[in-house]
């Protein structure tokens, strides 16, 4: 997979990054396909020299399927090359760990009834698309019977071993007495 990412340069404690197009399997500072910009985090945000990007080349690579890393996506969003990515803030991370665990324990029992209600609500939704798909499947008559017969044949096979396993489990208990 092709990535648009930062490649670190500079000396100790003085980072300077190149914005590069690279294969995701390569090392962070390893071989890259093309350099499309630079980023100097030591400069103030309002300085023009902080970020330099080749917008046309970046748009080309995005069109080719290159995926920007989260940091590069923010830089590209701030410079108007792509839409600004959603803010990945996690407000629960600011709460001390002990308090989060207490809240998690209290929330878990409340979530259980909701989880049970959700599958029941989804079941009618699943049946409706199948009913709509059936008339469309009747047009090609040869394919529809094969498709309908296969799921029907699989269902009894799955139920039969369960039914056989239960009597087998009860039989050894009776013999032991």
From Swiss-Prot:
The gene coding this protein: rpsP
Family in the record: Belongs to the bacterial ribosomal protein bS16 family.
Protein name from the UniProt record: Small ribosomal subunit protein bS16
Key words, A-Z: Ribonucleoprotein, Ribosomal protein
Record flagged with keyword Cell inner membrane: no
GO cellular component assignments: cytoplasm; small ribosomal subunit
Compositional bias segments (type: Low complexity): 107-122
UniProt keyword annotation of Ribosomal protein present: yes
